[in-house]
């Protein structure tokens, strides 16, 4: 057996983990300051979790792609391509892409029914009370724990393999930078770092693709790769593939992976509050487009990286440059995620190892930041605000969010160390997740899509489903392999059985329990009872001249409520500052701008928003059906049944299509967000120039003249509109 020796020194691992972590943390701290100074983005409790509910399409799409690029997206897809052939990588990508597009339906429904929500668990609590809330709290937290532990175990393993870095150290050090920038910038920092990480990953994937298929001295063309992979099939044919070929989509193991992936990833998308955070943070106009674009853009990443590095590993395994030459990778080495770095090292030397390491670092940290926000928002709004201090101020809630981020980061580092010592791999957690959590998928969907499902069905069906799934998984393992070990429970058929039972069994339980215990006939209007956090005290503390009541209307009730949230010293500061003013300062301008539109205008805007969401929902249903057929039926099934072995021309065409698709992804999530945000980028850079050149007065003049362009104004107008529309009674018409 060839030994895989670390191609890079330990210092490289620590430099990337600590150095890049510090760089990103510093960049986000600086960015948070710049946005506060030039765009008036003030990090309140609401802003920390929802980013003002106004994030545009491109940035949300980039964040969706980044959150869905796990280590397994890069490593497992390449491993499956290496083990099962060309269908392996496609099965991974198609099995995990559809859920993102389908989630657009839930994103739109959340915007329609509960525009003030912070987590999907708030919707569950509103509908089913504390019992239902407690049940789904378990599934939400379990999802975050499983996803984060998989990220840390896989990331630390790769750093150890490529640099010799201590695995325990990497488990604890990888989250440090992520926690720091998440604490300072909240979900907006997550969006921005997700964007940067996505750009880096896509660039590296394109570098690998052009190196393998165009410029490499070892390979250099699709035809050369094709010939070498066909030769590899003669040396070690694939069990379960037609004629043992890698260049066929008739693959039993890859077909099983497609089903397991499809089932398991419904849970990791629909039950992970991180995706709901992004949906809630998106502007209403972005809800559909962001998830549709994000899903399609993401598909190209695992498809092309596996098509490139999985097949390249097969093609170069007889090259003297291969890390384990003259032996190929063992199954243990391949399953440990070494396919991608082995191919990169063989083709690009140490540069390939560095690129692999950088890509894995980006995948771990970007996905983990989303998990931190997901857990902190659940802990803050579904535990602390609900059960500990229902009248907590925004300041207390943001402090709670910070504590939750730190605690979860530390806890997951410790848990990942335990998994490492227990010998549990990334692949094992990835395939096992669906067994644990997927029974809650259908009940969550029906919580938003059906009036009839009652409390008993909502609570009992996922619990029964999880129990039956675990039992089926273990019974199948015992009956087929006569013993229960990590290796036997990781086999294809037990994993397939457990995942199928988990996802599908609630489809039997829910109708029965709903019929026996009577349909609920839920009133969707109750979803409007979910409220936003009052940001008054936090905004006044940031700028004492901001007043969040309509002074012109002299609304005494609102003014008294606002004043009750502001300390006497802050009131005195406001009075003293106002006495000094000759002209209205920025705080007063902001206050006036927030109340510039009357209630009728706001209601008309909300009506149009609801109509736009209703149109988007119809399109989302169509896209869901279309892409389900395209990705899961129309392309793979005929190719599987025909037993077609790719010709050289067909394979070349497939490579070209995937490269073009990734260029589309690059445009959608790297260039388009810059275009959408060009005005904000320009005004921020211009304000920075004015400050650095001693012309700060111009910044003040611009902000006073254009309050409608300031984030605090747009977010507070939205908050005011939805606060005053709690009586809006058209929800039943749009569901």
UniProtKB/Swiss-Prot annotation:
TM helices/strands, residue ranges: 15-35, 86-106, 131-151, 167-187, 190-210, 254-274, 296-316, 344-364, 404-424, 426-446, 455-475, 497-517, 619-639, 651-671
Residues on Extracellular side: 36-85, 152-166, 211-253, 317-343, 425, 476-496, 640-650
Gene Ontology cellular-component annotations: cell periphery; endoplasmic reticulum; plasma membrane
One GO molecular-function entry: spermidine transmembrane transporter activity
Compartments where located: Membrane
Region (Disordered): 553-572
Keywords for this protein: Membrane, Transmembrane, Transmembrane helix, Transport
Family matches, as PROSITE patterns: NA_SOLUT_SYMP_3
Membrane disposition: Multi-pass membrane protein
One family name in Pfam for this protein: SSF
Record topology, Cytoplasmic segments: 1-14, 107-130, 188-189, 275-295, 365-403, 447-454, 518-618, 672-735
Gene Ontology biological process terms from the UniProt entry: putrescine transport; spermidine transport; urea transport
InterPro entries cross-referenced by the UniProt entry: DUR, Na/Glc_symporter_sf, Na/solute_symporter
Induction and repression of expression: By allophanate or its non-metabolized analog oxalurate. Sensitive to nitrogen catabolite repression.
Family of this protein: Belongs to the sodium:solute symporter (SSF) (TC 2.A.21) family.
Function: Required for active transport of urea.
Subunit structure of this chain's protein: May polymerize.
Name this polypeptide is given: Urea active transporter
Protein source organism: Saccharomyces cerevisiae (strain ATCC 204508 / S288c) (Baker's yeast)
């Amino acid at each position: 057996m060839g030994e895989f020796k670390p191609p890079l020194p330990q210092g490289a691992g620590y430099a990337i983990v600590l150095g890049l972590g510090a760089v990103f943390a510093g960049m986000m701290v600086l960015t948070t300051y710049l946005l506060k100074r030039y765009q008036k983005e003030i990090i309140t409790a609401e802003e920390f979790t929802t980013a003002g509910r106004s994030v545009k399409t491109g940035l949300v799409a980039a964040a969706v792609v980044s959150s869905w690029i796990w280590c397994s997206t890069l490593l497992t897809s390449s491993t499956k391509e290496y083990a099962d052939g060309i269908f392996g990588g496609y099965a991974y990508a198609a099995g995990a892409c559809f859920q993102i597009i389908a989630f657009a339906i839930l994103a739109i429904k959340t915007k329609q029914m509960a525009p003030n929500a912070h987590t999907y668990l708030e919707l569950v609590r509103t509908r089913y009370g504390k019992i239902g809330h407690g049940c789904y709290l378990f599934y939400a937290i379990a999802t975050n724990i499983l996803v984060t532990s998989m990220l840390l175990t896989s990331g630390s393993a790769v750093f150890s393999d490529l640099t010799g870095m201590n695995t325990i150290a990497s488990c604890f050090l990888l989250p440090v930078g992520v926690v720091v920038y998440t604490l300072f910038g909240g979900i907006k920092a997550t969006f921005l770092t997700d964007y940067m990480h996505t750009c880096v990953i896509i660039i590296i994937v394109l570098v690998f693709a052009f190196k393998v298929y165009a410029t490499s001295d070892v390979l250099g063309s699709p035809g050369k790769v094709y010939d070498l992979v066909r030769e590899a099939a003669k040396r070690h044919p694939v069990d379960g593939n037609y004629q043992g070929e890698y260049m066929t989509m008739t693959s039993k193991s890859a077909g099983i992976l497609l089903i397991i992936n499809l089932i398991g990833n419904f849970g990791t998308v629909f039950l992970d509050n991180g995706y709901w955070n992004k949906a809630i943070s998106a502007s209403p106009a972005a809800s559909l487009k962001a998830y549709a674009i994000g899903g399609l853009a993401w598909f190209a990443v695992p498809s092309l990286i596996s098509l490139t590095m999985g097949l390249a590993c097969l093609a170069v395994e007889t090259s003297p440059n291969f890390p384990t030459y003259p032996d190929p990778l063992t199954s243990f080495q391949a399953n440990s995620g070494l396919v991608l770095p082995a191919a990169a090292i063989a083709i690009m030397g140490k540069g390939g190892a560095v690129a692999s390491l950088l890509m894995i670092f980006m995948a771990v940290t970007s996905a983990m930041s989303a998990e931190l926000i997901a857990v902190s928002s659940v802990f803050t709004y579904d535990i602390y605000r609900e059960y500990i201090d229902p009248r907590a101020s925004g300041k207390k809630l943001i402090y709670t969010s910070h504590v939750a981020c730190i605690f979860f980061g530390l806890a997951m580092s410790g848990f990942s160390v335990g998994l490492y010592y227990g010998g549990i791999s990334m692949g094992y957690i990835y395939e096992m997740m669906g067994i644990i959590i997927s029974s809650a998928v259908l009940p969550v969907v029906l919580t938003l899509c059906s009036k009839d499902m009652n409390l008993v069905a909502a609570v009992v069906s996922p619990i029964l489903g999880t129990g039956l799934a675990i039992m089926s998984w273990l019974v199948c393992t015992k009956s087929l392999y006569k013993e229960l070990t990590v290796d036997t429970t990781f086999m294809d058929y037990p994993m397939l059985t457990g995942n199928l039972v988990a996802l599908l069994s609630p489809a039997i339980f829910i109708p029965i329990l709903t019929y026996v215990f009577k349909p609920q006939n839920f009133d969707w209007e109750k979803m409007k009872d979910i409220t936003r956090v009052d940001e008054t005290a936090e905004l006044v503390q940031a700028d004492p001249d901001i007043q969040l009541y309509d002074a012109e209307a002299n609304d005494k009730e609102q003014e008294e409520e606002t004043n009750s949230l502001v300390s006497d010293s802050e009131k005195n500061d406001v009075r003293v500052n106002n006495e000094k003013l000759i002209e209205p300062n920025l705080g007063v301008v902001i206050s006036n701008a927030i109340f510039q539109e009357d209630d009728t205008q706001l209601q008309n805007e909300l009506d149009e928003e609801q109509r736009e969401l209703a149109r988007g929902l119809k399109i989302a249903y169509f896209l869901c059906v279309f892409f389900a057929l395209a990705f899961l039926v129309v392309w793979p099934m005929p190719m599987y049944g025909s037993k077609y072995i790719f010709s050289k021309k067909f394979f070349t065409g497939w490579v070209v299509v995937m490269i073009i698709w990734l260029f589309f992804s690059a445009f959608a999530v790297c260039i388009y967000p810059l275009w959408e945000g060009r005005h904000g980028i320009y005004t921020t850079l211009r304000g920075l120039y004015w400050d650095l050149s001693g012309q700060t007065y111009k910044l003040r003049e611009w902000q006073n003249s254009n309050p409608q362009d300031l984030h605090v104004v747009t977010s507070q107008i939205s908050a005011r509109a939805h606060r005053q529309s709690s009586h809006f009674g058209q929800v039943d018409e749009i569901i």
